[in-house]
Amino acid sequence: VHVREDRRHINENDLKNILNFVNIPVNLEIAANPEMIEIGTQCNPKFVCFVPENRKEITTEGGLDVAKNFKELSKVLKPILETQINISIFIDPDKEQIKAIKDLGVSTVEFHTGSYANAFNKKENVDKELKKIRENVIFAKENGINCHAGHGLTFENVSKIAALPEIIELNIGHFIIADSIFNGLQNSILKMRNIINEAST
């Protein structure tokens, strides 16, 4: 669930209701600023993933630039890094970002798969984008960092990402909800899980 600064999708009351009534782990996406970090710390979900935000965007458009904003991030993230919440940061597949995340003391990254998904849709540079992800998940794993991935993943394009053994979690929301309008949520989740399981075995 993504509680945006502008509360465009859901707000903190929705988040509290979800945490109270859903008996599965919740992954909270928030911006890396003091207000949102306080919400994350108070609500205490199992996972918090820090993402960049732009008020004009329709959806998250890229990864957080940890290397460029390292000094500021190390300061604002300090309180939540001292909790028991599992922290990850949403980044583009880039070794400098991975190095910065390791220096920050964060043990998990979520790789932005949007460029791969766009390439897949256009049938252009798919191998190039996949190679970039593959090289970076291997680099992250070698540096002791857990690898998650997500953004733009669908029934058609998820297999190649799920087949990467270093990736231990995929975060897929928008597509499953969109598909569930026509096919039912349980059916959409089951179909996606079957594709992922088949690709990762």
Segments from the language model and where they lie:
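Glycine-enriched alpha-helix->loop->beta-strand junction motifs that scaffold or abut catalytic
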Residues: 21-24, 42-48, 82, 102-109, ...
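Hydrophobic faces of well-ordered beta-strands that scaffold small-molecule active sites
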Residues: 1, 26-30, 48-50, 87-89, ...
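Histidine/lysine/aspartate-rich catalytic loop segments that bind and position anionic ligands
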Residues: 86-139
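Catalytic cores of alpha/beta
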Residues: 34-43, 93-104, 149, 153-167
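C-terminal helical cap(s) of enzyme catalytic domains, especially alpha/beta-barrels
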Residues: 19, 62, 121-126, 178-201
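Glycine-rich phosphate-binding active-site loops on the catalytic face of alpha/beta enzymes
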Residues: 49-57, 108-120, 166-185
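Alpha-helix-loop-beta-strand connector modules within alpha/beta enzyme cores
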Residues: 7-34, 68-88, 126-149, 192-196, ...
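Hydrophobic, well-structured mid-protein blocks that either form specific transmembrane helices
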Residues: 48-107
